[in-house]
Amino acid sequence: MIEATSCGGVVIYRGKILTLYKSYKHKYEGWVLPKGTVEEGEDYKDTALREVKEEAGVTANIIKYVGKSQYSFCVPEDTVEKDVYWYLMSANSYYSKPQREEYFVDSGFYKFHEAYHLLRFSNEKQILEKAYNEYLDLKKANLW
């Protein structure tokens, strides 16, 4: 078994959530939240911000840590167990530009119910729901 760690962001601008569409050689297709692997010497917050910038072209600010998701997948002759640490983030505009080199072909900011139904993976839906509720609480308290 191989253990891996990634970090990502639930990025919100004016109540809408950033999602990315990945299409990899017709083997993997679907809407996801931006996330990626921690590089050597990098802390989790820096990883999350870097991945949002690289994958979506979005400059974001971390508001707070919202939780961890876990999943596993198979690679030739082994299984990867991955932990993903998620942060609630704010963006400064609706601008996004998907990173084609990583097979992202579309990106955009969507209303909660749209983003929730677009997302391919249930663990990302759970994180989205938790992060969005945190956002609503902050907004209600005039802290967003």
Located regions from the model:
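A generic structural signal for ordered secondary structure
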Residues: G8, Y13-L18, Y44-K45, Y65, ...
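N-terminal strand-loop-strand
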Residues: M1-L33
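Charged phosphate-binding loop/patch that engages nucleotide di/tri-phosphates or the phosphate backbone
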Residues: H117-W144
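Unchanged
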Residues: V38-Q126
